[in-house]
């Protein structure tokens, strides 16, 4: 038995993660539980990724607080550490992806699908469940907040679905109807069925041209 391994009861389906090492074996429903962890390295990589990601966010919040309180040097230290944690998280996610998918990251279409799946889980399962937990324990305001965040995730899912559909159809820079396209660098606006290959003002290429209505 190793810390962070997961064990499953083959009778009721209960799954537990071993958080502390101890003697003996795990039992449920009168039966010995089966270890279902086949790749502990992947498990600890994702735990490290989650921990570093949370630390990065916390340190950025702490930096803003220090800034507001007039402690600029402390704010800079918090922000520098946050940037370090971001890189740590990136390295851990890349290592996980290489172990499991033989590549560091997916392409944009694959990443959009990953985002769709994540947002769908959050709005259909995670936030409704978490909202209920808070409500059952008498935390009405927290329950409401979690439920409302879940509704935002629906919009995120819809946004990613639209972007993936457009990308997969080869219409990221073309449209069936006339639209306004804006240069991200200088703000030049062009109206037409496709974005300009080169901005006539600042000469930035196609990838800097995007639909103006998507910015509203």
Where do the language-model regions lie?
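Small, basic N-terminal interaction modules of short regulatory proteins
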Residues: 1-13
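Short, cysteine/histidine-rich loop/knuckle motifs that typically chelate Zn2+
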Residues: 10-11, 27-30, 185, 201
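Non-heme di-metal
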Residues: 15, 19-21, 38-216
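Generic amphipathic, hydrophobic interface segment in small proteins and small subunits
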Residues: 26-38
């Amino acid at each position: 038995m190793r810390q962070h391994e997961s064990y499953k009861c083959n009778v009721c389906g209960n799954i537990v993660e071993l958080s502390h090492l101890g003697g003996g074996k795990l039992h449920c429903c009168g039966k010995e539980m089966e270890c279902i962890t086949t790749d502990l390295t992947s498990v600890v990589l994702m735990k490290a990724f989650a921990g570093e990601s949370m630390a990065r966010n916390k340190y950025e919040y702490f930096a803003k607080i220090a800034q507001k309180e007039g402690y600029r040097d402390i704010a800079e230290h918090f922000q520098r550490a946050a940037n370090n944690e971001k890189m740590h998280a990136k390295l851990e996610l890349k290592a996980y992806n290489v172990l499991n998918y033989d590549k560091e990251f997916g392409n944009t279409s694959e990443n959009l699908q990953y985002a769709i799946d994540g947002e769908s889980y959050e709005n259909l399962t995670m936030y409704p469940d978490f909202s209920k937990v808070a409500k059952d324990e008498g935390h009405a305001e927290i329950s409401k907040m979690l439920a409302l965040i879940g509704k935002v995730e629906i919009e995120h899912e819809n946004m990613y679905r639209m972007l993936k559909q457009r990308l997969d159809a080869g219409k990221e820079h073309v449209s069936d109807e006339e639209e306004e396209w804006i240069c991200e660098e200088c703000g030049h606006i062009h109206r037409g069925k496709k974005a300009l290959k080169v901005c006539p003002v600042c000469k930035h290429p196609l990838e800097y041209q995007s639909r103006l209505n998507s910015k509203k």
